[in-house]
């Protein structure tokens, strides 16, 4: 199977973010499974909120979700990330993401 890149999640080392990470993580897993993409999670002390990026090959990471000030459900997070990936799939450098357009 051809790799469709990966999602990179940055989260705080604060234990208070674990519940949010689970919610966001489940949403990312749903999108990643549709694309055949990998997921990496990094805990950092210099991160105040949870951030999700998409990375395909090179070093460039595209921000697809920021949880700052949000308490959205898994479904809301999923639709937000999916919407960003859908839009990105029209860019010539990200045609591998076109599978997100199929239902």
Please name every model-derived segment.
Residues 7-9, 28, 39, 50-52, ...:
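Hydrophobic beta-strand residues in large extracellular and virion-surface proteins
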Residues 23-25, 29-30, 34, 86-88, ...:
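Compositionally biased, charge-rich low-complexity tracts
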Residues 33-41:
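A generic structural motif
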